[in-house]
Amino acid sequence: MAKKSLIEKENSKKKLVKKYNLLRQFLRREIKNSLRIQDKLIISEKLQSLPRNSARVRLRNRCSLTGRPRSNYRDFGFSRHVLREMAHTCVLPGVLKSSW
C-alpha cells in the first residue's frame, strides 16, 4: 500500500493536468503555427509560466486500489498483484487463467 500523501499528490497533479490541458494544447499549437521567432519566444515563455505539475508527463500510473506505482495494467487500472487476486476470485468478467 502506497503512502496516502503520495496518492493525494498524484490526484492533485491529475486535477492540474485537467485544468490546464486546453491552454497547453492551445499554446503548443500557436508555437507550431507562428512564423516569427519573437512570437514563438513569447508564447513559449507563457507555456513555461504554467505550473510544472500541469504537464501530463509528470503523471504516474498508479493502482486504483493500492496506489502501487509500478507494474500497472492500463486496461484495468490495477497492479499485477491486485489483478491476479481479482482474476482468481472471478471478480473481473472475461478474464481467464491461461493454460496450455
Swiss-Prot record:
It is found in: Plastid, Chloroplast. HAMAP family: Ribosomal_uS14_1. Pfam families: Ribosomal_S14. Keywords: Chloroplast, Plastid, Ribonucleoprotein, Ribosomal protein, RNA-binding, rRNA-binding. GO terms for cellular component: chloroplast; small ribosomal subunit. PANTHER family: 30S RIBOSOMAL PROTEIN S14, SMALL RIBOSOMAL SUBUNIT PROTEIN US14M. It comes from the Eukaryota. Part of the 30S ribosomal subunit. Binds 16S rRNA, required for the assembly of 30S particles. It comes from Adiantum capillus-veneris. One of its GO terms (molecular function) is rRNA binding. This is Small ribosomal subunit protein uS14c. Signal peptide: none annotated.
